[in-house]
């Protein structure tokens, strides 16, 4: 699966901004069929950042969210700034 097909859009809200600042986490809508390995590979390819942990959930509307925790040596704020959301 192509990295651009896996990662759809970043989720921007007060909650996600708090996660970026306090927990070094990013939140994206992802392709529903994407596995955690697909998501991790896409983050590495698109943002050159290593993933420490991924949690996923499917919303009642059928969209899949990925909560991505980056390793300590990477800053989620810098990745968010490169996307223009922070």
UniProtKB/Swiss-Prot annotation:
- Any single GO CC term annotated in Swiss-Prot or TrEMBL for this entry: ribonucleoprotein complex
Q: Which family does it belong to?
A: Belongs to the universal ribosomal protein uL23 family.
Q: Partners and quaternary state?
A: Part of the 50S ribosomal subunit. Contacts protein L29.
Which cysteine pairs make disulfide bonds? none
The UniProt keyword set, sorted, is: Ribonucleoprotein, Ribosomal protein, RNA-binding, rRNA-binding
Q: Which GO terms describe its molecular function?
A: rRNA binding; structural constituent of ribosome
- From the Swiss-Prot or TrEMBL record, give the protein name: Large ribosomal subunit protein uL23
Task of the protein = Binds to 23S rRNA. One of the proteins that surrounds the polypeptide exit tunnel on the outside of the ribosome.
- The coding gene here is rpl23
Which NCBIfam families does UniProt cross-reference here?
PRK14548.1, uL23_arch
Question: What is one Gene Ontology biological process annotated in the Swiss-Prot or TrEMBL record?
Answer: translation
């Amino acid at each position: 699966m192509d990295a651009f097909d896996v990662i759809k859009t970043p989720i921007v809200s007060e909650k996600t901004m708090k996660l970026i600042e306090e927990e070094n986490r990013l939140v994206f809508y992802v392709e529903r069929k994407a596995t955690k390995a697909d998501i991790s590979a896409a983050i590495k390819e698109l943002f050159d950042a290593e993933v420490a942990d991924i949690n996923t959930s499917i919303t009642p509307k059928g969209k899949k969210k990925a909560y991505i925790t980056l390793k300590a040596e990477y800053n989620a704020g810098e990745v968010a700034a490169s996307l223009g959301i922070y």
